[in-house]
């Protein structure tokens, strides 16, 4: 009887071990297959074949739901195939899945800036302003002293027509280092894009002042930065005159704006004699003078033509120099 029970127990243990090993083998095989799909998906991801990558990542997760490394890449693939403005059900599904997998990835790595940035981007694309803002503000908290984080937020607010918040971000960036001329350049660009000419002019002038006050900058570099700053100021002055109809801007004001632009562009040519672009806008400013003083049209047209010729001469010289340098590099 004891022998019979021993045989039964042995058979039970043997069958249990067979089942256990079979289960382990099956799990091991599934994981190996999952890794194969994951590896292929990564290749498709690198090659920017995102739809193919999606299929492979999803297959990998079916075989191994614990393959958590796939969450971020799968979410990023869905971000890449999502088309803003497309209200089809399929596209909405892409957006939903992008958010789902990126949130799963964030649960694994709560402080991963790339994941948070991607969540901000997909919510921005899906016009989920509050969610996008939440994630972008999280990114900014990681790098409170990085100017780029303020520029990114300002761009986000501007694109969503939250102009007061955009200005706030530009001003916060300037507050990081008020002596740094770069912050005023970005704020001036924002005002110019929104046709706020006077505010743009003001910030370009502050930029010029900050560059001029920089005692640590080498003279050659300072001259180049100042030439660029005066050029940009001149361009805004031309824009203000060109974009403002004659019945809105009086002749006296127009001449003042044109003169400010003329002085700035002339300064740019003095600081950078081989810089062709200021001459093109000097020509355009003379055309604007004819609006304020139509009786002097012939005189101003003649001056404008001189500026065009100077621009063409310098432009031709610049292109020839660039071509020479390219040819020289090929010979090395």
Question: What is the predicted role of each segment?
Answer:
Residues 31, 65, 110, 144, ...:
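Short coil turns that delineate tetratricopeptide repeat
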Residues 32-59, 63, 121, 125:
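Alpha-helical segment of the N-proximal tetratricopeptide repeat
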Residues 59-60, 104-105, 138-139, 172-173, ...:
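Canonical positions in the second alpha-helix
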């Amino acid at each position: 009887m004891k022998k019979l029970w021993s045989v039964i127990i042995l058979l039970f243990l043997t069958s249990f071990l067979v089942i256990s090993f079979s289960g382990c083998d099956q799990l091991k095989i599934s994981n190996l297959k999952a890794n194969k799909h994951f590896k292929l998906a990564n290749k498709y991801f690198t090659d920017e074949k995102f739809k193919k990558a999606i299929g492979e990542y999803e297959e990998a997760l079916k075989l191994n739901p614990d393959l958590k490394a796939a969450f971020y890449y799968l979410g990023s693939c869905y971000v890449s195939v999502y088309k803003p403005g497309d209200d089809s059900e399929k596209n909405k599904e892409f957006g939903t899945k992008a958010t789902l997998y990126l949130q799963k990835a964030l649960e694994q790595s709560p402080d991963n800036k790339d994941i948070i940035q991607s969540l901000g981007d997909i919510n921005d694309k899906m016009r989920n302003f509050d969610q996008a803002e939440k994630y972008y503000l999280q990114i900014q908290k990681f790098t409170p002293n990085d100017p780029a984080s303020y520029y990114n937020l300002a761009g986000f607010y501007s694109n969503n027509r939250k102009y007061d918040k955009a200005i706030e971000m530009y001003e916060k960036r300037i507050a990081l280092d008020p002596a740094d001329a770069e912050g005023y350049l970005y704020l001036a660009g924002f005002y110019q894009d929104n046709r706020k000419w006077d505010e743009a002019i003001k910030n370009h002038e502050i930029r010029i002042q900050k560059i001029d006050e920089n005692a640590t900058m080498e003279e050659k570099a300072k001259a180049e930065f100042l030439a660029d700053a005066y050029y940009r100021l001149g361009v805004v002055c031309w824009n203000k005159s060109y974009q403002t109809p004659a019945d809105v801007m009086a002749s006296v004001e127009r001449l003042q704006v044109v003169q400010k632009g003329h002085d700035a562009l002339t300064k740019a040519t003095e600081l950078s004699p081989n810089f062709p672009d200021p001459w093109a806008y000097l020509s355009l400013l003379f055309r604007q003078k004819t609006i304020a003083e139509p009786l002097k049209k012939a005189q101003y047209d003649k001056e404008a033509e001189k500026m065009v010729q100077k621009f063409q001469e310098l432009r031709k010289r610049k292109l020839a120099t660039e071509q020479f340098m390219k040819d020289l590099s090929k010979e090395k």
